[in-house]
Amino acid sequence: MILVGRYASPFVRRVGVVLHTLGTPFEHKGLSTATDLAAIKGYNPIARVPALMLDNGENLMESAAIIDSILDMTPGQTLLPATGAARRQVLQHCAIMCSGLDKAIQYIYEPRRRPAEKVHQPVLDGLAEQITASLTMLEALAAKGTFQGGAQANLADITVAVGWFFLHKGLPQIAVASQFPNLVALSARCETLPAFQACQLEG
């Protein structure tokens, strides 16, 4: 397998962490959407990351679809329950974080990709509100002990921990550590795991 994209992307990183957690061998090509679009299009014509090339040459895109496929190919995996309410719960917790991450990337791109006079502050304010709502929901869940982290981490733990690390690093004015202490603690438990250590952000 070949995983395409930089670990600076939380979506690429969560796929990498899942692969390492499962012990699935793969090659990582840290291609950037900023500088390597032509190469990325060889794996995904839409030029989005992550992309995953399977050993049979099939190309997969979008982190949720990639992870679902990986788990389906891994008998006995424990990251995501097979059926029922427990499965829905894990997927919903992932969805909350991924929704916040989608808005965070829009927030980061808005001032970078527009001339200063065309950046609309109400848009940024609305995105910040949505990111905060995502984190507030997850902090409340974490306070109830929903996320275990550590050696017992499931897909939601991985996704939330990866997402918090990205948000706190990239948008510390929104992902304020003192406001989300349980997410900070979850991240700390997870970042020491070998699978997380193997997917360090590029410089």
Question: Locations of the language-model features?
Answer:
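GST-like domain detector, emphasizing the conserved glutathione-binding G-site
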Residues: 1-122
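Conserved G/P- and acidic residue-centered "switch" motifs that form tight phosphate/ATP-binding loops
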Residues: 9, 157, 193
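GST-like fold's C-terminal all-alpha helical module
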Residues: 97-188
